[in-house]
Amino acid sequence: LEFRRVLFRSRVLLITDAGMPTVSDPGYRAVRMAIDSGFEVKALPGPSAVTTALALSGLSSDRFCFEGFAPRSEIARNRYFEELKEEERTMIFFEAPHRVCEFLKSAALVFGEKRPASISREMTKTHEETVRGSLEELRLWSESKEMLGEFTIVIEGLDRDSLEYSDADLARRLKDLEGTGLSRRDAIAKLAKELRISKRRVFDIAHQ
């Protein structure tokens, strides 16, 4: 209510000492209130950890998504990553220093230890640092030193063309699809299309 009164009396400038205002930041509520009250809102381009970390990562920037902060608890975090397991775009996250190691542990578990990623901290500041490698390599790195500063983590999206599935993996996935009520024929077709593999291979596994 007080902020709304200020809007009607003067020009308001929203600034922050922690990156771009309103990006994974409660400042968006002030912007929404101004818009809802009929005020004109303008943005001055400034530094953004999202695009800066992406540029430093060396990972694909053709398509990317910003996911903010992952859940704090291990169970919720793992479940959250499971929802992103099929994401093909490069993913960008923010994380607090005391949770970086646990974040990487969960990410390696769900996305795979070999998934390429990068970690950037203190960007545009004196102690700026970017470390690149697999999720497992980054996890080991995070355990070997004290985590200080604000972190932005970039993880490569799923590359379906490079995936390798064992017969056991395909058999389990096929069983799961049939468990949803699909006929075996439809389950075979759906699995082959989703994983971009031949129907013949899935058919042979289904009839072993």
Residue ranges, per PLM feature:
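Short, small-residue-biased leader/transition segments that mark boundaries at the very start
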Residues: L1-L7
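Short, hinge-like loop/turn segments at secondary-structure boundaries
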Residues: F8, V31, S57-D62, V110-F111, ...
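A contiguous loop/helix-start segment that scaffolds small-molecule binding in enzyme catalytic cores
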Residues: R11, T90, P97-Q208
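Acidic beta-strand-to-loop metal/phosphate-binding motif
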Residues: V12-P21, M91-E95
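Acidic, metal-coordinating catalytic cores used for nucleic-acid/nucleotide bond scission
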Residues: A18-P26, R72, P97
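Glycine-centered tight-turn and secondary-structure capping sites
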Residues: P26-Y28, R184
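Class I SAM-dependent methyltransferase SAM-binding "motif I" and its flanking Rossmann-like core
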Residues: R29-E87
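General beta-strand structural signal in soluble alpha/beta enzymes
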Residues: A43-G46, F93, I119
